[in-house]
From Swiss-Prot:
This is Chaperonin GroEL. HAMAP family: CH60. Together with its co-chaperonin GroES, plays an essential role in assisting protein folding. The GroEL-GroES system forms a nano-cage that allows encapsulation of the non-native substrate proteins and provides a physical environment optimized to promote and accelerate protein folding. Signal peptide: none annotated. Forms a cylinder of 14 subunits composed of two heptameric rings stacked back-to-back. Interacts with the co-chaperonin GroES. SUPFAM superfamilies: GroEL apical domain-like (SSF52029), GroEL equatorial domain-like (SSF48592), GroEL-intermediate domain like (SSF54849). Gene3D superfamilies: GroEL (3.50.7.10), GroEL-like equatorial domain (1.10.560.10), TCP-1-like chaperonin intermediate domain (3.30.260.10). One of its GO terms (molecular function) is ATP-dependent protein folding chaperone. It comes from Brucella anthropi (strain ATCC 49188 / DSM 6882 / CCUG 24695 / JCM 21032 / LMG 3331 / NBRC 15819 / NCTC 12168 / Alc 37). PROSITE patterns: CHAPERONINS_CPN60. Its main location: cytoplasm.
């Protein structure tokens, strides 16, 4: 076992704080409408330019192992916020850094870290309740567009496009973001369906960078039982190979020998194929397979209907222009089903929704209806160069996630104003001085996002924050984009509550862990062995020419 380096107390926390600061200082310059770009070197191709906090955080790896631990813990704040809310990663990083810095000072002054953490948790719980209480529900397409615009760093075109997409496929509909082949950014709505099952083996992936399997103009085999042996499938597999088209198998499961054989064939390049578990369970699985069959113009291979695998022909398989399979989801785009049959199926599901008395069944039926009737919206992001397209795509992804979050939990005034106002409303009391100090840490940290946004815009943060707090109106704040004070909600400067809430909760959670750290352990760097000396007995070579 390799030797370890162990650091304790203050020296451990100082190293960790250094790592936190390096990561946060790189990420926080991107915050706000006047946030700066970060350029990331890539091992191949052009450098990447981004304003996406989590993309910057993911690139940072420090040489010093103890500093790196601090940086990676803060990176977790950004990643977790991105996973839950899809946006707000930079805000979360700024909050995390502020809480850790203040907390480290308090611990250095001799305060109890556990009581500090309890105080921080008390304050955060109260602020979250305050934010949810102040949230304004969004109903109109204009409000949706405003949220998208803010999250896309003030680009109104992106906000409007996302609002249009949500209007066309519904709030629960599937919206995907792709790189365009042209310089224009455009929206396309395609009939399609997505379900929450991914590929059964990563070897089916066709795009290793994104870890997705994209199969164009594919056949789709729908089977309601498990496949553990491919013998019965050979006739249909051979028929598909003759057409040179890809095949997607959707079955209860594909296991053992069957899965291994498919993977080997895919790797050898003889068969473009992917296997996916069927969505749902029991009777619901049968119904969802039937939905997919109607959407793709295929048949469910079921022994109940007297169809055996050995007798399957190409015309029993479904067809789709594109099937995209990630680790967790499968999207079927532009299935070959007849419109009349799809409409009949939609009517049937609507009828079932009206008749059912179970809320759970109704919810599941509505999900199926959205999948069948909603379609898939595709936003194709264009730009003059590949670097520009990638940077813009990051912003569109953020804007889309923020918009979904806003529809879910509502909005509050943006620009860090909601947190700034909440800091003045904290009334929680600790049971001792150290818990009070923890509450005060959160009070001060809540000002950090607003201060950073104004600093990035080249303004004096203390003056702006002071002026905002002088006005009692909840929605009064500073619009950094045009340099004016006023009602931020009316001006369209808004943040989704879910994003702000998640950023604060994750920042406080990880910061609390960092403050209460008393020891750190890392592997010592390996010492390179001294190179062996030249063997003796090599004399007598002086007469050779070199």
């Amino acid at each position: 076992m390799a030797a370890k380096d162990v650091k304790f107390g203050r020296s451990a926390r100082e190293k960790m704080l250094r790592g936190v600061d390096i990561l946060a200082d790189a990420v926080k310059v991107t915050l706000g409408p006047k946030g700066r770009n970060v350029v990331i070197d890539k091992s191949f191709g052009a450098p990447r330019i981004t304003k996406d906090g989590v993309s910057v955080a993911k690139e940072i790896e420090l040489e010093d192992k103890f500093e790196n631990m601090g940086a990676q813990m803060l990176r977790e704040v950004a990643s977790k916020t991105n996973d839950t809310a899809g946006d707000g990663t930079t805000t979360a990083t700024v909050l995390g850094q502020a809480i850790v810095q203040e907390g480290a000072k308090a611990v250095a002054a001799g305060m109890n870290p556990m009581d500090l953490k309890r105080g921080i948790d008390l304050a955060v719980t109260e602020v979250v309740a305050e934010l949810l209480g102040k949230a304004k529900k969004i109903n109109t397409s204009e409000e949706v567009a405003q949220v998208g615009t803010i999250s896309a760093n003030g680009e109104a075109e992106i906000g409007k496009m996302i609002a249009d997409a949500m209007q066309k496929v519904g709030n629960e509909g599937v919206i995907t973001v792709e790189e365009a082949k042209t310089a224009e950014t455009e929206l396309e709505v395609v009939e399609g369906m997505q379900f929450d099952r991914g590929y059964l083996s990563p070897y089916f992936v066709t795009n290793p960078e994104k870890m997705v399997a994209d199969l164009e103009d594919a056949y789709i085999l729908l089977h309601e039982k498990k496949l553990s042996n491919l013998q019965a499938l050979l006739p249909v597999l051979e028929a598909v190979v003759q057409t040179s088209k890809p095949l997607v198998i959707i079955a209860e499961d594909v296991e053992g020998e069957a899965l291994a054989t498919l993977v080997v064939n895919k790797l050898r390049g003889g068969l473009k194929i992917a296997a996916v578990k069927a969505p749902g369970f029991g009777d619901r699985r049968k119904a969802m397979l039937e939905d997919i069959a109607i959407l793709t113009g295929g048949q469910v291979i079921s022994e109940d209907l007297g169809i055996k695998l050995e007798t399957v022909t190409l015309d029993m398989l479904g067809r789709a222009k594109k099937v995209s399979i990630s680790k967790e989801n499968t999207t079927i785009v532009d299935g070959a089903g007849q419109k009349a049959e799809i409409d009949a199926r939609v009517s049937q599901i609507k009828q079932q929704i009206e008749e059912t008395s179970s809320d759970y069944d109704r919810e599941k039926l509505q999900e199926r209806l959205a999948k069948l009737a909603g379609g898939v919206a595709v936003i194709r992001v264009g730009g003059a160069t590949e670097v520009e397209v990638k940077e813009k795509k990051d912003r569109v992804d953020d804007a889309l996630n923020a918009t979904r979050a806003a529809v879910e939990e509502g909005i509050v005034a943006g620009g860090g104003t909601a947190l700034l106002r909440a800091s003045a409303k904290i009334s929680a009391k600790g049971i001792n001085a150290d818990q009070e100090a923890g509450i005060n840490i959160v009070r001060r940290a809540l000002q950090a996002p607003a201060r950073q946004i104004t600093t990035n815009a080249g303004e004096e943060a203390s003056v702006i924050v002071g002026k905002i707090l002088e006005n009692a109106s909840e929605t009064y704040g500073y619009n950094t984009a045009n340099g004016e004070f006023g009602d931020l909600i009316k001006a369209g400067v808004v943040d989704p509550v879910k994003v702000v809430r998640t950023a604060l909760q994750n920042a406080a959670s990880v910061a609390g862990l960092l403050i209460t750290t008393e020891a750190m352990i890392a592997e010592l760097p390996k010492k390179d062995a001294a190179p062996a000396g030249m063997p003796g007995g090599m004399g007598g070579m002086g007469g050779m020419d070199f």
